[in-house]
C-alpha cells in the first residue's frame, strides 16, 4: 500500500491533511514577520532559510528514517562522511565571504604570511553549524569539539602567534591538516576543573614539558574525538615548575600522526563504549606516559614559563581567569540557541500531530486532539516556551560575540583585558543560568511532547526517542546544570549582598537590572504590589524581578544567620532558573515592543503578546508555591493566573499551526513521519516504515524462524530444566 490507499479519503477521520490545511487558513499570522522576529532580523532570517534549504537538498547531510536504524559503527562512519562534506561547505563559505570564488583560499590562508582569519570570514559557517545541531546533534558535536572547544581553548589561552599557528597555519579551523579534541574532563573530576590531576612538568634541560597521567582517576575521560579522529588535543594539566604547582593550564599535545592516524609514543587511547545517545561521536579515554612537548606548546597568553636558571613563571592572576571563561562559554552559549532550535523541531511535530490526529467523540467525525483542553495545556505552553527562548538566545549569542571581539582585540592591553574580564564574568553568570534552564526545558519538552503523540511518539521514525537520548547530555556536559545554577545563584547572591551593604558592584548586563538599591528597597517596602495583578504587558516579566529580590533577600538573611552558604543551595538553583525566566521574558518584551521587532502586522503582534503572556503564566503557575510563600502573589491572584492561562490557550490554538510554520523547518530537517508539513500523518508514517522494512531479505520471516518453530512445536521437555522434585514442590509455597 502506498500513497494510493483503499481507505476512503473523504472520510473525515482519515483526512489529517485537510485538518492542517483548515488550521492554516483559519489564522492570518504573518509567518515571515514572525520568522524575522525569532531570528533577529529579515536578513538573518533569509540566511537561516537559505542554509536550511541547502541542507534539506543535500542527502549527504539530511537522511530519512534510515538514520534512526543505524548501528553505532554506521553512525561513526556516517558522521565522518558528513564532516568531510561540511568541510567543503566551510571552504565555500569562506570563499563567499572573501568573494574569491575561483581561488584556493584555504591554502593561501595557511601561509605564514597570510592575514588572520576574521570573524566575518567564519560568520556564514558559524550560522550553518548552529543549524547542523538541529539536524544531527552528534555531527554538530563531533565537528564542534574541533572547531569550538579546541579552537576556543587556543583563542582564549594562546598568544596571537599560537592562535595563528595552530588554528590557521596548521589548518584546524579549516578542518584540514590536523583535527583537535578537548581534554579537560578526567575519570575522577568533571565540574571541579581546579582539581584536575594530569601533570605538565617543566624540564629545564630540554626546555620541554613532560605530560603525565599520575594515576587511574587522572585518565582523561569522555573526550569527544579521542577514540578515532583527533590528531591533537588541548590538554588541561597542572603546571609544575621546580616542584611548585601553579594550577591548571592548557597545553597542546599531539596524539596521532595525521598522515597515518597511528598513536604517538607515550599515548594510550581507548573507546569508552556505548552511551545513551550520540554514538556518532567517538568519545574516548587518554593516558599520557612521559609525553614530551616543546615549551611553546603551552598556551601562554596569561601564564608564561621563562627558561633560565632557575626558570621563572609569569602570571596575570586576574586575567588568567579569562581562560576559564573563554573555553567553555562558546558551548554554553550555543546550547541555549540549540535549545530553541531543537525545541522548535519537536514542537512542530507534536503540534501538527495534535491537529491531524482524531480520537473519540462522534464516530463519523472524531474530535481532534488539539480540541481537548488538557491536550492544549500539554502542547501549547511548550510552544510558548520555545518562543520565549528565541530572543534571549539571540541576545546571548550577540553578547558573546561582542565580548569575544573585545577579548581578541585587547591584545596585551591590561586595562582593556580587565574591562572585558568584568563583562565575561557577567556573561558567565548569564550563560550558566540560561544554559541550565533552557537545556532542562527542552529535555522536558521532548519527552512531554513524545507522550502527547501517544504510541506513535514511541516510534524511532518519528524522532523523539533518538532526540531525547541525544539531547539529555546537554544537561550534564560543559557544566552540570545543578552546578551551573549554584554558580550563577551564588554570583547573583554575592552581588545582591554587596549592593545591600553599600558596596560598588559592577553590573554589565540588563538582565541584572533588578540588582539596584532603589529597586531592592521598592520591592522590600511593598512598592511593586501592582505588578502582581499582571495588568500591563511589562508586568509579565517584571513579576520575576520581584520574586528574585525577595528570594535573594531570604537567602542573604539565612546565610547571615547561620554562616552556612550550602544551606541555601536548593534556593540558589531556583534563583538561577528564575533569573533565566526574567532574562528571556525581558528580552522578548523589549524586542517585540521596539521598532526593531520586524512585526508590522498588528494582528500578528497581538498573537505574539499572547504567547509571551502564556509562557510567563505557565511558569508562575508551575512555581505557585514559591510565589505564595514569598508573598509575591495571594491565593486569589494565583487563581487569576490559572484562569488567565486556561482562557489564553484556545486563543493561541487558533494560530498554533502557523506559529510552527514560522520556524521554517523543511521536512528533511524535521525527519519525522508524523511531522511533515502536509499533515498526511498516516500515509507518511506507513510509507516510511514499509520502505525501511523493504530492505529485509524475507519480509515477515525472521532470521531466527527455526528457533520459533522448534520451541512452538516442542514436546514435554520439563525435565530438561533440571528442576528437582523438591524444588518443584516448593514452587507453590
Curated annotation (Swiss-Prot):
A molecular function annotated in GO for this UniProt entry is: FAD binding
Location(s) in or outside the cell: Peroxisome
Q: Which cofactor does it need?
A: FAD
> Which reactions fall under this protein's catalytic activity?
a 2,3-saturated acyl-CoA + O2 = a (2E)-enoyl-CoA + H2O2
Q: Name one GO biological process term.
A: fatty acid beta-oxidation using acyl-CoA oxidase
UniProt keyword annotations, A-Z: FAD, Fatty acid metabolism, Flavoprotein, Lipid metabolism, Oxidoreductase, Peroxisome
E.C. designation(s): 1.3.3.6
- Which is one Pfam family of this protein? ACOX
Keyword Nucleotide-binding among record annotations: no
Asked whether the keyword Endoplasmic reticulum is assigned, the reply is no
Pathway annotation from the record: Lipid metabolism; peroxisomal fatty acid beta-oxidation
Q: What is its main location?
A: other
User: Which PANTHER family does the entry mention?
Assistant: ACYL-COENZYME A OXIDASE-LIKE PROTEIN, ELECTRON TRANSPORT OXIDOREDUCTASE
Family to which this protein belongs: Belongs to the acyl-CoA oxidase family.
Designated name of the protein: Acyl-coenzyme A oxidase
Which organism encodes this protein? Answer: Eremothecium gossypii (strain ATCC 10895 / CBS 109.51 / FGSC 9923 / NRRL Y-1056) (Yeast)
* Gene (UniProt): POX1
